[in-house]
Amino acid sequence: MILVLDVGNTNIVLGVYDDRELISVWRLSTDSKRTADEYGVQVIDLFLQSKLKPEDITGSIISSVVPTIMYSLEHMIIKYFQVSPIIVGPGVKTGINVKYDNPREVGADRIVNAVAAHEIYNRSLIIIDFGTATTFCAVTSAGDYLGGAICPGIKISSSALFEMAAKLPRVEIIRPQNIIGKNTVSSMQSGIVYGYIGQVDYIVKKMKMEMMDLGEEEPLVIATGGLAKLINEGTKSIDIIDSVLTLTGLRLIYEKNKE
């Protein structure tokens, strides 16, 4: 079995694979102040609750966009699972040809998603990840990572309204039935959610045009991340939602790099 970790700005998603089967998924808060032992105790407890044996873990891989937490997580895995994790970054085999001006600038999570989507669908792709930031990534049928777009996440946008506008309240992020709000809360929800849906539709439309101008077939649009289902309810731009796309990518990269 292998332990995979997708470390985001807000949450750490952990998955356990038995061969190619994902048998457990957990979500922890990202906290750079926590020690290896604090994370270790929590992860071991999750294993025991799921009736899994830590000693059955034979390998691990981490993708992270939070450098300050890596020391704790890497040493947690070494100490509590007796394996040295693969860290997704320069020098790790992915099978993806990154066409960015500076390939080192591309977030590990974006590469991991590209690996999974390319392996599964093997065609032109646009990958949307609704996380703390929302990312759009363009991948060709040959596996070239062309680049993409990075936007503030929905929760960041909502928090900014509350924090920067004195009279606006904090609101739950839900899609209101009507776009014309009848009160402050529904008006904010309309602007946040429908504004985001419009953003998705426009960026996907323009990315498709640019990719097809390069000779690619019309891309398939894959979405992942916690708010993908909410946005998908109001758009026809998304073809497939894959909630474990990043974990799948981590497993695939592990298989490409295991000794």
From Swiss-Prot:
EC number annotated for this UniProt entry: 2.7.1.33
Protein name: Type III pantothenate kinase
Lineage: Bacteria, Bacillati, Bacillota, Clostridia, Eubacteriales
Binding of ATP, residues: 6-13, 132
Gene Ontology cellular-component annotations: cytoplasm
GO-annotated molecular function: ATP binding; metal ion binding; pantothenate kinase activity
Gene: coaX
Subcellular location, principal: cytoplasm
EC category name: transferase
Pathway this chain belongs to: Cofactor biosynthesis; coenzyme A biosynthesis; CoA from (R)-pantothenate: step 1/5
PANTHER family for the chain: TYPE III PANTOTHENATE KINASE (PTHR34265:SF1)
Bound cofactor: record note: A monovalent cation. Ammonium or potassium.
Residues at which substrate binds: 100, 107-110, 184
